[in-house]
């Protein structure tokens, strides 16, 4: 267990920590161990076979690498043609789409309704929130939303945006490891 969210705060548990009802737990595990864990707690696991990612930055690149290694079909929507070329060369198994990811008609035409994972990774928090809310309305897939600013995390928690990724937390966690 890496962290526990409780009552709007984040706790890094120690050996004496006790989980409470309503705690949101973040943990780190291999895919096999995570699957085993979810089976033990009788939580159904629905493997993802395809993902639609909006935003083609560094997080999208590394996430796509991981997904492709796990045989997940990846489509990345990126509006910058030069970045699309870089992604296409770096991730030849992924489908790179040069389009404005906030174009709702385009997202629907790309199969948003049938995607099993929708990931909003643009550099604009508000756009990510709106994209995720749109995806939530049109898809039963898993949702992941990147949020850069931490100031509104209590408000965002009430919006049911799926898994929220805070790059600042990820950087801190990475630095603390060493």
Regions found by a protein language model. Name each.
Residues 1-178:
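Cytosolic regulatory regions of ion transport systems
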